[in-house]
Amino acid sequence: MEKIISKLNGCLGWELRAATMYSHYAAYVKGIHRLQLKTHFEAEATESHGHADIVRAAIVKLDGKAVTERDSTKIVHTTNYEIMLEEAMKTEQRAAESYQEVLNMIKDDDEMYDALEQIFFDEARSVEELKRLS
């Protein structure tokens, strides 16, 4: 159980980092694509907060202690939308990989599996969307 809680806490910290990164990028994006990407980054920040809530609930369900701080991986500060999209791709790919690992660990809990599988699908969709934006 501790291994699952630890992995979920990793996902939670990553979602908190993603929310911070996307909010930061929405504020700083410049250039001809600013309006489209500002909206995109704001939506991703909101999605990350929602994912964090679901992951936190899963940790509570397992009687674990949820982290309150974001993952410490550096957030690249830039106003260049191309770099922002590259960083977003790295973030979404890592998130999808992490959720895939968790899904392999929780196959016996249908409710939790379904909730986290939906997040995995959201992350995979984000990767595909970023491929089209890049």
Segment roles from a protein language model:
Residues 1-134:
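Iron-associated oxidoreductase/ferritin-like identity signal
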